[in-house]
Curated annotation (Swiss-Prot):
The lineage of its organism: Bacteria, Pseudomonadati, Pseudomonadota, Gammaproteobacteria, Enterobacterales. Belongs to the class-II aminoacyl-tRNA synthetase family. Homodimer. Pfam families: tRNA-synt_2, tRNA_anti-codon. SUPFAM superfamilies: Class II aaRS and biotin synthetases, Nucleic acid-binding proteins. Binds 3 Mg(2+) ions per subunit. Mg(2+) 2 binds at residue 423. This is Lysine--tRNA ligase. It comes from the Bacteria. Its EC number is 6.1.1.6.
Length: 506
């Protein structure tokens, strides 16, 4: 008798109502016996460790070693064959097969307990390792216990939960059912650990800055608003930690970084979630060119340590992070991907506006030349930046926190880097001229008054901090979720966030 699910997804035995009723009755019996949810079983191994250590050994070698293990996990399949059964146990490391025989257990346990347990129940078992005739590493159970009664059945297709909406709304089912999802989030955890290791190795100090702020700053985005009852003031979930981190550099912490959540009250898309993870770092006595070297080194290190190779495959694209990234200015990128564009046409407001409008861009009368150039770049070039590429020379108009370029103050010493047609990060030499910063904040405030919801607020305290002296500094932000999409071959941000934002169910 087999208890996996049929191909059409319907349980083989009872309909759902009867299934739930049956499981509740079984739990009621366990409660009466006083053993409903025991908590005294301890395991000494997990499945992947056992496969790694003993998977290549023969049955004769395992018999000679006489290895007894205690493992625990969720029963995913069971095949009852009279006086003996095979079951699959799934734990954090993967799966391992159990062999359960009536005569190896206390009298009555096999028929009265084990055979009545359900798929999805969490079991603890102890027994010796052996190999079946087909060579599968298994545990010959001498003790087996029910640790948690599952009140609901496994997803219809335990080999892979097919419904995308269910995967995101009930991530726990996705993690039970899909090996690929479990692996994605394991890799995410390793990447996060390796980023922190890299930063520590480069003498950065990890810090935490406020998630609720009285003035949101550090990015052009619409914030979430909340209210602090005790203080009687509105506050904002942060859109970026930048201005607080630079205050720390003013205070003497010369290399700082933070990995944490940002919140932006914007739309949902395969690349956007309103709550997302960013890393920002700031290093004194450095400029944007030092950040370019740091980014290339970080990606090379991450891919080697986590994936074992600097070559990454994502869909039909391949990236080699062992090589330097391509570099080009924003104007060069526009002219490269829209060859009919003359460079000098981008330097004139009228001709640049005509180019933008020919691309279907609705130019707002409040925009300056820098904003128009940036919109044209995003429309013509951004999606074509497949191989790792730094785009430099962003206009000051769209870079209110970046240092102006010494040779041409229309531009800033800033870059964004793109991989697979996606912006992954943004870095620049920091503006440390308090008067220039105050003037740019004033421009942003005017834009906000004119209806630009994403323009920055004027942060007077930050200007005061700059007046105390910010050393020459470079700062970088990397979108961790987009990085995870890249390194785990995922095609939507929902696949790399455990609990993504979703529209309410109707």
């Amino acid at each position: 008798m087999s208890e996996s699910h049929s191909q059409d997804g319907a349980p083989q035995a009872l309909d759902m109502n009867n299934e739930l009723r049956s499981r509740r009755e079984k739990l009621g019996q366990l409660r009466q016996q006083g053993i409903a949810f025991p908590n005294d079983f301890r395991r000494d191994a997990v499945s992947d460790q056992l496969h790694a250590r003993y998977g290549e050994k023969s049955n004769e070698e395992l018999e000679a070693l006489n290895i007894e293990v205690s493992i625990a996990g969720r029963m995913m399949t069971r095949r009852i064959m009279g006086k003996a059964s095979f079951a699959t146990l799934q734990d954090v490391g993967g799966k391992i097969q159990l062999y359960v025989a009536r005569d190896d257990l206390p009298e009555g346990q096999y028929n009265e307990q084990f055979k009545k347990w359900d798929l999805g129940d969490i079991l603890g078992t102890r027994g010796k390792l052996f190999k079946t005739r087909t060579g599968e590493l298994s545990v010959h159970c001498s003790e087996i216990r029910l640790l948690t009664k599952a009140m609901r059945p496994l997803p219809d297709k335990f080999h892979g939960l097919a419904d995308q909406e269910t995967r995101y709304r009930q991530r726990y089912l996705d993690l039970i059912a899909n090996d690929e999802s479990r692996q994605t989030f394991k890799v995410r955890s390793r990447i996060m650990a390796e980023i922190r290791r890299f930063m520590m190795d480069n003498d950065f100090m990890e810090v935490e800055t406020p998630m609720m702020q009285t003035i949101p700053g550090g990015a052009a985005a619409r914030p979430f608003i909340t209210h602090h009852n005790a203080l009687g003031i509105d506050m904002y979930l942060r859109i970026a930690p930048e201005l607080y981190l630079k205050r720390l550099v003013v205070g003497g912490f010369e290399r700082v970084f933070e990995i944490n959540r940002n919140f932006r009250n914007e739309g949902l898309s395969p690349r956007h979630n309103p709550e997302f993870t960013m890393m920002e770092l700031y290093m004194a006595y450095a400029d944007y060119r030092d950040l370019i070297v740091l980014v290339e080194t970080l990606f090379r290190t991450l891919t080697q340590r986590v994936l074992g190779s600097s070559v990454v495959h994502n869909g039909d694209q391949t990236f080699d992070f062992g090589k330097p990234f391509t570099q080009m200015t924003m104007k060069e990128a526009i002219c490269h991907y829209r060859p009919e564009t003359r460079p000098e046409a981008l330097d004139d407001m009228a001709s640049a506006t005509a180019i933008a409008e020919s691309l279907g861009i609705k130019v707002d009368k409040s925009w300056g030349l820098g904003r128009v150039q940036t919109e044209v770049f995003e429309e013509t070039a951004e999606s074509h930046l497949i191989q790792p590429t730094f785009i430099t020379a962003y206009p000051a108009e769209v870079s209110p926190l970046a240092r102006r370029n010494d040779d041409n103050p229309f531009f800033t010493d800033r870059f964004e880097f793109f991989i697979g047609g996606r912006e992954i990060g943004n870095g620049f030499s920091e503006l440390n001229d308090a008067e220039d910063q105050a003037a740019r904040f004033a421009e942003q405030a005017q834009a906000k008054d004119a209806g630009d919801d994403e323009a920055m607020f004027y942060d007077e305290d930050y200007v005061t901090a700059l007046e105390h002296g910010l050393p020459p500094t470079a700062g970088l932000g990397i979108g961790i979720d987009r990085l995870m999409m890249l390194l785990t071959n995922s095609h939507t941000i929902r696949d790399v966030i455990l609990f993504p934002a979703l529209r309410p169910q109707k």
